[in-house]
């Protein structure tokens, strides 16, 4: 059961969202996306990127021209650096169970083997997805944005899911860059889940 509220506030968007979250008013942010420049290619405006980067709960960013379709095929790129748990994957599991979706877990690398930590996290992820349809994919010599674009040419994806794993300043910069690059060509909804829920 869902409840929706309209709130008018004299505050910045991100500050208001943070205050609402701290007051336990919401557990998902849904945003329409349209770039501030008016160019169709610039999907994520600065508000959307800022909310995605700083939100303490999952954010679903929906392109302005998107017409609803059931998320039957979900793309979930991962570097396996996150210690996965059921709480972190709740949104994906809920969607997958409701729509009978299949999750494509995509790992992009430059030919390096997974570390011991990454292997353990991958195994944990496999265990968490054991009751839903899922496939693991691995691609070499591509960055994340290239891998996502190329994968979408092969499989009709209805939802892209990313984990915002901002442990350090460098990773935070990398995530913003990835979001901006993905936002340039994305025509499907993007669900971003903070790694610390």
What are these regions (language model features)?
Residues 1-29, 130-180, 184, 188, ...:
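Structural beta-alpha unit
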Residues 3, 72-73, 100-104:
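Residues at the starts of beta-strands that form the adenosine-phosphate
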Residues 13, 17-63:
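Hydrophobic alpha-helical segments and helix pairs
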Residues 28-33, 53-88, 184-197:
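Intrinsically disordered or low-complexity boundary/linker segments at protein termini
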Residues 42, 72, 87, 114-118, ...:
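Short, well-ordered secondary-structure micro-motifs
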Residues 44-47, 89-90, 119-122, 174-179:
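Charged helix-capping and loop-helix junction motifs
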Residues 47, 55, 99, 130-132, ...:
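Short, structured coil segments at secondary-structure junctions
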Residues 86-130:
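Redox- and metal-dependent alpha/beta enzyme cores, enriched for Fe-S-associated oxidoreductases
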């Amino acid at each position: 059961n869902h409840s929706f509220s309209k709130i008018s506030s004299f505050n910045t968007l991100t500050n208001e969202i943070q205050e609402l979250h701290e007051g336990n008013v919401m557990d998902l942010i849904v945003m329409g996306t349209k770039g501030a420049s008016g160019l169709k290619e610039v999907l994520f405006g600065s508000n959307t990127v800022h909310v995605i980067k700083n939100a303490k709960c999952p954010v679903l960013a929906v392109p302005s021209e998107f017409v609803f379709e059931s998320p039957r095929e979900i793309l979930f790129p991962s570097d396996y650096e996150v210690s996965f748990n059921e709480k972190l994957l709740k949104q994906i599991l809920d969607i997958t169970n409701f729509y009978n979706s299949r999750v494509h877990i995509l790992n992009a690398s430059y030919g390096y083997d997974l570390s011991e930590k990454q292997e353990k996290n991958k195994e944990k992820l496999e265990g968490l997805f054991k009751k839903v349809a899922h496939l693991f994919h691995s691609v070499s010599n591509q960055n994340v944005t290239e891998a996502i674009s190329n994968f979408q040419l092969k499989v009709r994806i209805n939802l892209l899911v990313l984990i915002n794993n901002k442990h350090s300043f460098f990773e935070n910069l990398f995530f913003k860059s990835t979001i901006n690059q993905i936002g340039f060509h994305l025509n499907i909804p993007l669900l971003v889940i903070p790694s610390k829920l």
